[in-house]
């Protein structure tokens, strides 16, 4: 990794080799920045406070060896990244304003993409992870991870049934809690439908009545106009001397008929005049019929206006016209059917809920059985690891139990609480020595014991669910003496099959490393900065001496440091 302008680190290259690398340095020198840098490359949260004072941004670049056929390589290439000679190049930039950018294989990617790949690349463990192990849900997750497919299969089936049950319960609760609102809505719909049914409107009736009302309201004027028009076309019997349209057209017809044989063009015009005559007679006849049929009956007009008023009362409430009113009635009838079916739906949902609870109880039992079997193997494996970490008489076990809940699922004749991960409460217990009762690690484990339990769990995982790189950030806190030597020895064995990076303050642990990096702080009087360098030979002895006695030149400390290095070399 290359780190620039991150915290106290100005510009440093961290050369992480295969095997076991220990990162050491005085308190405040910036060892944690190495962990933070790797965290940023793995999609961790960015913070403007990480940027070195006076710098515009902090940059971390990393090169991670990845086999071309590895799942992480395939996923990276799907995102548009390219491998560089079997390695994946990752960079992360954090601005002084807190903005963050990520690049993967030369391509800009969302930070979430780095986090997606992280689990396949590096397992990071620090003191916060130790505290996390004190939580019951994390202990259950650890057991499920160890169990693998034996728990993953039943858990997937359980999770699907749980999802379906929650959906049914939510719908049932919604219908039940909204019963009053839905009843009020049904009453309003029923009232509206009854009101519309009482009027019995027909489609288009409002338009027809409007036209009829207009006609009846102007009946006298319409009749007079029709009579005048009829007289103009067909003549007025009371005025035999008057000239009408039909007479004039007939005269024109006779004049043309007398000579039409002499010119086809004139004959055609004569035909058209004949058509005009026919049209005039037809229109005149219809005008006469219109005038005769027109009824200026005031009773009919009153009835029409009354009907229109009834229709208007509906359009004021239910739609802009009768077509909209009828559409509202159709939709409301369908909605009313739905609302009136609530009781039936509640019965259906209740039956479905009970059936799903019964199914979930069976799946929860299968999950409990799988966890119980895996817990015995997991506890035995962790106990065996603790024996190699200077806790030869410690015993680890798991308590798997359920809590009574009348609203829960039935398992083995008991009704117990359940959740998205089953009905089990899983708790990790530790008996540190013979005769000691097994107690929850949250209550009975010291800091040093908790560190070793955490390491033992991780080592067991390395054998069942390995990743290429492990980073431990001072997980040896609270440990010293022989226990520290055993931790160093166990980490060295883990490094035979994976890359292991440890940030440590214990010389006994650092001595077992294949490579030791020193994070050191310098001050030129105005600016404080930290750098990282590889320790070799005499420099490494001096650093181990400082870690042992606080003095680099103490002969006793130097002798002890050389002895630690020799012991570690012999152990390899």
From Swiss-Prot:
It holds the Pfam family SMC_N. Keywords: ATP-binding, DNA damage, DNA repair, Nucleotide-binding. SUPFAM superfamilies: P-loop containing nucleoside triphosphate hydrolases. GO terms for biological process: DNA recombination; DNA repair; SOS response. The keyword DNA repair applies. ATP binds at residues 25-32. GO terms for molecular function: ATP binding. One of its GO terms (cellular component) is bacterial nucleoid. The keyword DNA damage applies. CDD domains: ABC_RecN (cd03241). May be involved in recombinational repair of damaged DNA. Belongs to the RecN family. This is DNA repair protein RecN. The lineage of its organism: Bacteria, Bacillati, Actinomycetota, Actinomycetes, Kitasatosporales. The gene is recN.
